[in-house]
UniProtKB/Swiss-Prot annotation:
Encoding gene (name): leuC
Protein name according to UniProt: 3-isopropylmalate dehydratase large subunit
Oligomer and partners: Heterodimer of LeuC and LeuD.
Annotated InterPro entries: 3-IsopropMal_deHydase_lsu (IPR004430), Acnase/IPM_dHydase_lsu_aba_1/3 (IPR015931), Acoase/IPM_deHydtase_lsu_aba (IPR001030), Aconitase_4Fe-4S_BS (IPR018136), Aconitase_4Fe-4S_dom (IPR036008), IPM_dehydratase_rel_enz (IPR050067), IPMI_cat (IPR033941)
Organism: Shewanella halifaxensis (strain HAW-EB4)
Pfam families according to UniProt: Aconitase (PF00330)
Cofactor: [4Fe-4S] cluster
GO MF annotations in UniProt: 3-isopropylmalate dehydratase activity; 4 iron, 4 sulfur cluster binding; metal ion binding
Family from the record: Belongs to the aconitase/IPM isomerase family. LeuC type 1 subfamily.
Cofactor stoichiometry and binding remark: Binds 1 [4Fe-4S] cluster per subunit.
Group of enzyme by EC: lyase
Function: Catalyzes the isomerization between 2-isopropylmalate and 3-isopropylmalate, via the formation of 2-isopropylmaleate.
Pathway entry: Amino-acid biosynthesis; L-leucine biosynthesis; L-leucine from 3-methyl-2-oxobutanoate: step 2/4
Amino acid sequence: MAKTLYEKVWDNHIVFAGEGEAPIIYVDRHLVHEVTSPQAFSGLKVAGRKLRAPEKTFATMDHNTSTTSASLDALSPMARTQVETLERNCKEFGVRLYDIHHKNQGIVHVMGPELGITLPGTVIVCGDSHTATHGAFGALAFGIGTSEVEHVMATQTLRQLKAKTMKIEVRGKVADGITAKDIVLAIIGKIGMDGGTGYVVEFCGEAIEALSMEGRMTVCNMAIEMGAKAGMIAPDTTTAEYLEGREFAPKGASWEQAVEAWSQLKTDADAVFDATVVIEAKDIAPQLTWGTNPGQVVAIDQLVPNPLDATNPTVRTSIENALQYVDLTAGTLMTDVSINKVFIGSCTNSRIEDLRAAAVHAKGRKVADGVKAIVVPGSGLVKEQAEAEGLDKIFLEAGFEWRLPGCSMCLAMNDDKLEVGDRCASTSNRNFEGRQGRGSRTHLVSPAMAAAAAVAGHFVDIRKPY
């Protein structure tokens, strides 16, 4: 029977499937951070249980950490309690921890792949909604709740219903300067923030295959923003080249065997998807969100939408509410929208490729008056590589702040928050009301678009001189 990539990985991980019951699947990798793990560890202690597979559990500190200091004294009392609790729990249960002093510490969805923890054909879970990032490697990766975190800790399994399958093909080649972030925002703009609900999405097509692993991670990272359970991309030579030699990747003869096995992880030619979406790559322009969800997105050369153009009353009301919150007027050119904050970072866009793209627009320029711009590398290794290439100096000379790794301004959970009324060009993944701080307005863009906005003081079409 012909199978999709998702179905192959799913079937390989079924431990038990009782009649009329959701199957139990095996979990190969469990990624843990300081926010969603304390209650799970406590549950194990109360029940007197051990951690089932400490060697398959990896922890880091990222959500609440400071990006200005590696000292615990820089943390709020709650944040300090969380990171200290994670440290104690990892020591007690034998979990490998990348703490704030470790050179490999970073955002869980950045440091996992770069260490080779993420491998094709595996099932990966984490108490974080953007776990879909790891699907870029042909893994089945999805976020879970705290009670499920405890269940995985205790059993290394999960009870899960099988999802429907969706193919999203990005046909042809994108124009010069169009990034993975533009591709995925264009996809979400087409199918909406709930268009993938109930599905595991496989991204494919020439434009997807041409992406680096960093770009593929950006695309899969935002699968959840279209409502999907997970996003996946079939592994290929690009995948293998990225993984070879990384710390937790197979070595020697095991490597050759793994690469051979990974070559089978692709959708069969005659497999049938439950839904198919096709996007023409040539039609994708630089994208940015205008509203309060990632589906409210337009191209840089388009106008802020007019709610009167919406025939669906629910959509019309949604547009009206979004415009009121973000304080924009229908019909405004997006290039006329000014910003006063810029955030380059997050599990979506904080890898070395992202920082290089942003540095191109920062080099030899200055951050505009009245604009505060911060650059937050996704991990210690990304920071080290960027500094070796001199990217930090480019940003600093242009007036950007160069920070320590962490989730930072993606979410208002640490000290990197926006103030009421701030308008931010952000490379993160969510532009919900208050996501970056109470009363703040977020516009999702690529790293290049964010850096260009920082120096211009407003959004610009990076395809043209500015």
